[in-house]
Each structure stands twice: as structure tokens, then as C-alpha cells.
């Protein structure tokens, strides 16, 4: 009985490691670039994020050095 539970535990551990490895491999590369259509000083990440998602149709946006940068898949 002890061998069966050890085998089941080993199988579950290998399954978890395999799934975790697959998640890392399938992650997309992203690139960040200056939002050329954003106007004004970037004060809040929310306004930049809204612009990048809704106007530029990209993944997200954040403010860096008072400028809006959009994130997209490379």
C-alpha cells in the first residue's frame, strides 16, 4: 500500500512540474514602446492603460517619465 501512495505522489509531482513548465514556455514576449497618439503629460497609469487598450488596441499601458508607454506582443 505504501508503494502505491508513493507512486501516486510521485506522479502528481511530475504532473505539476510538467504543467508549470508548459505555462512558462507558452508565455508571450511583450515589448513596450512610446504611445505616439497619447497627448499630454502622463500622470496616471489608468489613463495611459485606457488609451493603449481602447484607442491603440494593445495589451496595456503605463506611465514612465511622464510619458505613456504601451505594451504589445512582440
UniProtKB/Swiss-Prot annotation:
Keyword vocabulary terms for this entry: Antimicrobial, Disulfide bond, Fungicide, Pathogenesis-related protein, Plant defense, Secreted, Signal
Where is the signal peptide, in residue numbers? 1-28
Q: Would I find Zinc among this entry's keywords?
A: no
Regarding tissue, the record states: Pods.
Coarsely, its chief localization is secreted
Extract the InterPro entries matched here: Scorpion_toxin-like (IPR003614), Scorpion_toxin-like_sf (IPR036574)
Q: Name one Pfam family in it.
A: Gamma-thionin
Location comes to: Secreted
Kindly list the cysteine pairs connected by disulfide bridges: 31-74, 42-63, 48-68, 52-70
Q: Does the keyword Protease apply?
A: no
Q: State the Gene Ontology BP annotations.
A: defense response to fungus; killing of cells of another organism
Q: Tell me where on the tree of life, at the top rank, the source sits.
A: Eukaryota
Q: What induces it?
A: Upon contact with the plant pathogen fungus Fusarium solani.
GO cellular component terms attached to this protein's record: extracellular region
- Biological role: Possesses antifungal activity.
- UniProt record similarity statement: Belongs to the DEFL family.
User: What's the protein called, per UniProt?
Assistant: Defensin-like protein 39
Q: Which gene encodes it?
A: PI39
